[in-house]
Amino acid sequence: MLNGLTRVSTSSELESILDIVQSSGEIAVVFISPSIGDLETITSETQRRQLRIAGIPRGGYTILPAIPLYDDELLQMCERYTAANDYEKAQIRDSLFMREYPLFAYSVRNHKALFHPADYVSRILQFCSYYVQAPDADVLSLLDRSPFLHISPIKEICTHIRLIARGTPLAPEDSESPAPEQLRFHAESDAEKLAAERAGAMSIATSSGGASETEQLSLFSGVVPSALFQKDAVEEVDKDTEETMVDLTGEETVDAVHSFQAEYLTLDGLELVTKAAIFYDREGEGQRIVAVYIPGGVPEDTCRAAAAVLEPAATKKNLRALTNGGLPPDTGLVGYYDYLTNPTRHKCRETEFSRRNWGLLAQSEPLLKHLDKLYSQLAPMHHHLQKVAIPSQYQLCGTVFSTITVNRNFRTAVHTDKGDFRSGLGVLSVINGEFEGCHLAIKKLKKAFQLKVGDVLLFDTSLEHGNTEVINPEIHWQRTSIVCYLRTGLMSSVCEMERRKHLNRLILQQLRNTEVLNTTVNINGADSSLPPLFVPTRLASHLAPVQLAALGFIVERTEKQSGCVVAMTMGLGKTLVALTLCFSQLHLAPQADILILTPKPIISHWVDEKNKWAMHGLHFPHFVASDGLNSLEFEQQLLEYERQKNNEKPKLGHVFVINGEYLAGFLRRFKRFTPLLIIVDEGHRVAAKGNKLTESLDRLRCNLRIVLSGTPLQNDASELYRLVGWVNKGVGRVLPPKRFQELANDINQFVEGDDGAFYNAVMAQEYIQDWMRGFVFREMENDLPPLHDYLLICGSSDVQREYEEKLGLTETTMTALKATEHRPHHLSTHPACYLAFISDSYQSMVSGWTVRAQANTSRMRVSQLEEIDTMRLEHYVQMVENEQLDTFIDLSGKMRVLVDIVLRVQARKEKLIIFSLYVGSQDLIHRTLTALRVCTFTVRGRDSQDRRRRAMQEFSENKDLIVLVLSTKIAAYGLDFTAANHVVLFDSWWNPQVDAQAIARAYRRNQRKPVTVYRLISATENKFVLSSQTRKIALFKCILHERTSRQALPDELEDCAANEKDEERRSFWAKLKTTLLAGGTRALLNVYRYQESVRESE
């Protein structure tokens, strides 16, 4: 039924009529007929093009152009026009041609417009003016003659203004219109209501008291406002104790002071700058602007007018005593601030002074506009990046500033400013006073800048700076200065989610109790400053707050022609975020194309997600995926696209989901392919140096680039730099690669154990975080059940120790082994796995646990084993065949621990996933567990997508299937195994994010149980891998979790077996520690909590 309602074929005659409306701006009347189509066809195609439809004349329908203004803009314009005299009305009509119409550009995309949107708006204004003044008798007749009275928001606006002007209600009695300030629900009309009624009639429940499944799934049945969003996605407001008025003044932190002893600068050793100049931090490669000095940059009268309003903001209630010799100075904040560390629900909002004085602050607008203009002229790239980054609702007077620090008679000690946007600059100006000296000095430059009233300094606030001495301080002196900047905390995921909840509450307020009948809703419609964000009405309630916040972050960047990185921890639903973004973009630009690049194993996951959410309204005209399951269908879709590109058929939007290996061939075939949007899943791949994928993507003319990654840092910080630089090319011009690498080295030095590097590491960490916040949406936390993550150090049997000695394996020699040396890993699995590996006998092991070679080459390799090795291998095979399983298992510490874990999980009637990097280990584990009669299924990297899908379904539905054995590096991606709540990492890789991806197959959305992770580590071969992992995890925490972290030293790790809080688990650890392997070594030597392998600094 859904497909029938949402995918209708369109007649060529109807297409031609709608093309004319869209291009000419004229209205058209259509009637249901075989050549035009039925009502569903007409409404569906009209909606897709964003045209409007009215249910007149009788028996027919009138098609109108899209309205090129947001609802609140149109309301304000109509109110002004209806209240104006004839001369003023002419001026208003003339001014229509001087403004921009972004909605118009969207609605006529790929159609050459033959009319100016101002003409259409003028017609609406004139109609509204006539309607408001018309006699009651004429109003009634207008219902049958004017289609404007049948479309939203025009009919609501006319009603509202007439009611205020004349006290006469709107004549139409059949309209249950929401308030005129409602957000725009796309193409609301009489005709659409008729379609809704028809669909609703098809889905009425026949059973007593209950709704049928059809009714619940119908896209045309109404949605009550309370069901539009998840409950926790809507802001809660306690009217009795309104938290937005809580006084937090004085708790803001804007400085980073690096000593408890205040350091004051003097002019000694500093050059005094008095002439306009630009300063860089170094010569040659890697230089960047750190200061721009503009004496007399702002007229003095502009400064003093603003000072009269801003000076009262400077009080002694603040936390800046350390920058004033221990005494609180006169200082304060104006605008917006991020109270992220305060225990209040509303963390991102106006300062108290701003809340109380918004009306007066308008007098400071000329100053702010002037400073903003100077900034854009003298540091254009910094200004551009700041304009891209700043959320619209935090812009002061439409500038790139969110916050102003006001200082009065305050000679600051040496400090750096904390929390400023590092791709931008702070803008300092003295706006009032009589004084001598008190110059602003920057230590690194060895320069002091003379600042009098009207002088301006743009500078990098992360550099240590302070004021020089005041000359003749005994004479009464006065000095008021301001610093304007962007607070990066306002772009945090906390603020994004808070803002999203606030917008959702406004939407529900505007809807009041009106049932939502439309299939699509603009969830940004409550704030006209935000770009539109359309989502299917029935999908909105399935989007978690973090997903809605991520969508809001993305569309604000794309509206400003910038990309971004979406760094959400695995399992939070990045794919649904991206699909919803695609839906909104195609809703606004129905003929555009979108390119999604993803690893081949994940393509089927995208298809599954698209199909899963289709029942909630997430539909696309063409969704083309190269998943390899149906190559004929894929080719047919490409041929259809070719016909549309060649104008043989009407062009519709396409979403292409392809893997990077196919991209070059795709671009050769479609040489003029120009996507509106590029999304790269597992986007850390574009961070690699010399990446051919990046080279191919760079040839596409597309600025809107979105990177999705739960693990944007894989090995080092430079990867994040390359990611951000790829989504926005401008960042490299304000932070050169050489400078970023210096910062990364400071962090790495501390991460690797140099405690003396702590101060530099903290400074570098804060700088990088403040630099990337405008372009990286980070949400590394989740609200999933608890995760218990353990390191299990396993012993070695006597046979394993014998081979370790032969290989010369010690903790020291392991550090010298290459990553391609796999013998130690196979030996840690089991001696049988090691012997099979060096004899290349995998194939025969899989086929029947025999070492009989099938080819001369294999015979030669087997014969190269020493005689005792050959005998041992045959003996091990016989052990399994003769069901001497305990003896066989006790030859390996890892295998013994693994089997006991599996049997424990089986006894608890739970499920387990085992990840391993090596085919030999996977085979041995599978055979051993099968011999133990544990129902086990194995998925390897070479397995087809269909097999993987069947594995997911079987594992979820078959209660007897206890264990899945998966390939870590390949099968871990794109799979959902939340049926399991135990995960074993049988071996670990150098990159901890590979292991993290594996764990996320079970620990993700929809997981309802606590998850336990067991990382099996041998005493020798895996310890160096663990050391490499913890270093990278510490780096990851430093940069993405904002926690200064380092590797734990060996003596800092504490065995947790004895103090385990869970009694059953404590007993289990004790049992494993008393279990002996062949040769008498304990199977389990130590148990550590994995998170303790990385230490966070206070």
UniProtKB/Swiss-Prot annotation:
Binds 1 Fe(2+) ion per subunit. Fe cation binds at H415, D417, H465. SMART domains: DEXDc (SM00487), HELICc (SM00490). Disruption phenotype: Does not lead to death. The genome contains reduced level of DNA base J in the DNA. Residues 897-1057 form the Helicase C-terminal domain. In the C-terminal section; belongs to the SNF2/RAD54 helicase family. Dioxygenase that catalyzes the first step of DNA base J (beta-d-glucosyl-HOMedU) biosynthesis by converting thymine to 5-hydroxymethyluracil (HOMedU). DNA base J is a hypermodified thymidine residue found in the genome of kinetoplastid parasites, which is localized primarily to repetitive DNA, namely the telomeres, and is implicated in the regulation of antigenic variation. Probably also acts as a DNA helicase. Recognizes and binds specific regions of the genome, hydrolyzes ATP and allows the DNA base J de novo synthesis. This is Bifunctional helicase and thymine dioxygenase JBP2. It comes from Leishmania tarentolae (Sauroleishmania tarentolae). The lineage of its organism: Eukaryota, Discoba, Euglenozoa, Kinetoplastea, Metakinetoplastina.
